[in-house]
Each structure stands twice: as structure tokens, then as C-alpha cells.
Amino acid sequence: MLKTTLLFFVTALCEIIGCFLPWLWLKRGASVWWLLPAAASLALFVWLLTLHPAASGRVYAAYGGVYVCTALLWLRVVDGVRLTVYDWCGALIALCGMLIIVVGWGRT
């Protein structure tokens, strides 16, 4: 379970970075060269999703819970926005959903 969660976390970071760098280019006037590491990050994101031993749709559904938490961590650390009680509750619910799916994928 811990290995799966850590892999989902790294996967989420790759996805967020791969989307954030083009956002910097489009919204903040960063160099177009940032699109190269963005593309590499998104390619790594896709590859990481293939490392799980479950059906793709089930992996994507479970990954979503960790993605929500990682995005909120990004919101706090990178964007500097303080998390609300609603953010924390949403993250907890998302992680519970991920846990239920991951525990169940070995039993089907």
C-alpha cells in the first residue's frame, strides 16, 4: 500500500509539473523552452501510471485520490495559499476512496 501511494505521489508530481510549466509560459511569459521539460514530465507521468498491476481505469480512479492531495500540497507550497478545513476534508475523502479501490483491486 505504501509503495502504491508513493508511486501515485511521484506520478502526481510529474503530472502537475508537466501542466504547470506550460501554464508559466502562457500566463507568466516564461520561456518557451519550459515546454521541453513539461513534455518530458508528462511522458514520465504516463509511464509511471503503467507500473501498477491493475486495470487502467481502476488505476486512474485510485490515482485521483492521491492527485487531489498532491495538488493541495502544491497549492500550499508553490502557490503559498493556506489550506482550509474544506481542503483538508476533501483530501481525506479522496484518500479514503483511493484506499478502498486499492485494497479491492487485489481481491477481484
From Swiss-Prot:
Can you say where in the cell this protein is located?
A: Cell inner membrane
Any one of the GO CC terms: plasma membrane
Residues exposed to the Periplasmic side: 1-5, 52-60, 106-108
What InterPro entries does UniProt report for this protein, alphabetically?
UPF0060
Q: List the disulfide bonds.
A: none
Membrane topology of the entry: Multi-pass membrane protein
* Chief site of localization: membrane
Keyword set, alphabetical order: Cell inner membrane, Cell membrane, Membrane, Transmembrane, Transmembrane helix
Annotated TM spans: 6-26, 31-51, 61-81, 85-105
Q: What ranges does the Cytoplasmic topological domain annotation cover?
A: 27-30, 82-84
Does this UniProt record's set of keywords contain Metal-binding? no
The record ties this protein, via PANTHER family, to: UPF0060 MEMBRANE PROTEIN YNFA
Q: Member of which family?
A: Belongs to the UPF0060 family.
What protein name does the entry list?
A: UPF0060 membrane protein YnfA
